[in-house]
Swiss-Prot record:
The keyword Heme does not apply. The keyword Transferase does not apply. NCBIfam families: SMC-Scp complex subunit ScpB (TIGR00281). PANTHER family: SEGREGATION AND CONDENSATION PROTEIN B. Pfam families: SMC_ScpB (PF04079). This is Segregation and condensation protein B. It is found in: Cytoplasm. The lineage of its organism: Bacteria, Bacillati, Mycoplasmatota, Mycoplasmoidales, Mycoplasmoidaceae.
Amino acid sequence: MKTKIKKITKKFNLKKDTEVKPLSTQELIEEQKEFSQAVDKLMTKKQKPTFEDIGSSIVDFETSDNDKFYESVRDAIEKTSEIVDDLDQSELTKNSYEQKELSAKAIIQAALYVAGRNGMTLQELNKILPKIHQDQLFKELEEMIYSYDQNLNFGLTIKNYGGRYKILTKAAVKKDMQRYVSERFKNPLNKSLMEVLAIVAYNQPCTRVRINEIRGVDSLSLVDNLLEKGLIVEVGRADTPGRPFLYNVSEKFFDLFGIESIDDLPQIKHFDPDSYQEGDFFDSNRYDENE
């Protein structure tokens, strides 16, 4: 701290035995401003002196008395040095370098960002924040969702798809993003695959036999195709002769169609598989269609 005082004294040429060169009023104002900024750096949050404490004798900017001004500056620096030297140095170091812990929301945001298109469940987030109960994590997420949706300075939102929370781009930025992203994709599912997937979604848990009955044709290879693509999963066996496998749609299904649960599916009479044949890049899991 003594070194800092010496530097400031040297900077302002404030040695008592040094002859002060007269300054103009404007130069005087600029010197006083520089001094004020330098003194501010010496103040601490623990015991912050006021200008009444350290510079009660500093003259107004309009003064033309150079000797009086520099005498006031010397007095202020000496008094500041005494105040700072009296402070607990360990406390000064702690206040200067101690890092504050990130909030739960900040950690959740970072986790969802890293998870990307896979998203994270409450259980997975709880492993990252084990000291926070899942009920509290749910509350934090709900507050984040509300905050993101209400903030017009945010181009992102958070959605829950099949129990997995994901960071997505808002619907409002779709047109702006399309100016820079020209990539379009062809839905990898043809009409037959879409029909089988719809049957599973609306009738889950569903067996292969049930799928064949509804479509009226053999759909075994189509079921295998959907299993391979990860859009349906085995969830057990039916209590019927032969104990056939039961199938549900997967988390990837919710991600692909941008819905949070089966309840969000359109009514059967309104469902048109052809409407899903083509889509824009931002209609996928990185884009929220529900705004």
